[in-house]
């Protein structure tokens, strides 16, 4: 084989200068799962095929959160929300977020709405285990989109340990005079006198 030629064809000329062994390393480095499965094997067996890609990635579709730059121009350029914000729901679809809480019991979880955020927290009581005391707790804050009324948010816990938080979108409001109906009051030809 001649020097500088690869044993396979490349569609992108910039890949010719890269080290072939480094390609798989860079894709794993940017992966949030660090090469691990998103769920244990027994949990993934019961999910339908269409739900697994949505639950295992941080962003719907093929984009991973580590591959898209986060900055003020990222929202305008890629349509990616800023850090700490949830993606806006599509028109007509409810807003929905899933949080994996499989290691917590329902009585150990708390969901509350405060200052435009849904706050999910969980806490295990301290347990005596081998060599010490173990305590687990977490808090996750999720910002509500502007299209969602905080009063309509509700949460449910699946048997697999997923906390599903959802809310319907607020229908768009129209100001008086913008709708298609006639703004004028009907004129009656009858006169009524009050005595």
Curated annotation (Swiss-Prot):
Modified residues (Phosphothreonine): 62
Keywords recorded for this protein, A-Z: Chaperone, Cytoplasm, Methylation, Nucleus, Phosphoprotein, Stress response
Record has Phosphoprotein as a keyword: yes
GO terms under cellular component: cytoplasm; nucleus; protein folding chaperone complex
GO biological process, one term: cellular response to unfolded protein
sHSP domain span: 73-184
Molecular functions (GO terms): protein homodimerization activity
Known partners and oligomeric status: Monomer. Forms a ternary complex with BAG3 and HSPA1A. Component of the chaperone-assisted selective autophagy (CASA) complex consisting of BAG3, HSPA8/HSC70, HSPB8 and STUB1/CHIP. Interacts with HSPB1. Interacts with DNAJB6. Interacts with BAG3.
Homology family: Belongs to the small heat shock protein (HSP20) family.
Protein name (Swiss-Prot/TrEMBL): Heat shock protein beta-8
Native source organism of the sequence: Macaca mulatta
Name of the encoding gene: HSPB8
């Amino acid at each position: 084989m001649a020097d500088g030629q690869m044993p396979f064809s490349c569609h992108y000329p910039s890949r010719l200068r890269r080290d072939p062994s480094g390609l798989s390393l860079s894709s794993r480095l940017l992966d949030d799962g660090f090469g691990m499965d998103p769920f244990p094997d027994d949990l993934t067996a019961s999910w339908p095929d269409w739900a697994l890609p949505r639950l295992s990635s941080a962003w719907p579709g093929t984009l991973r959160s580590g591959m898209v730059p986060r900055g003020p121009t990222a929202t305008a350029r890629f349509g990616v929300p800023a850090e700490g914000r949830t993606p806006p729901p599509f028109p007509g679809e409810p807003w929905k977020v899933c949080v994996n809480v499989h290691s917590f019991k329902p009585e150990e979880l708390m969901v509350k709405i405060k200052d435009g955020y849904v706050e999910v927290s969980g806490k295990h009581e301290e347990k005596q285990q081998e060599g010490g005391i173990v305590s687990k707790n977490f808090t996750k804050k999720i910002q509500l989109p502007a299209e969602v009324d905080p009063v309509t948010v509700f949460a449910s816990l699946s048997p697999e340990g997923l906390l599903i938080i959802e809310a319907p979108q607020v229908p768009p409001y129209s100001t008086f005079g913008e709708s298609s109906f006639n703004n004028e009051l009907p004129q009656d030809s009858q006169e009524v006198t009050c005595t």
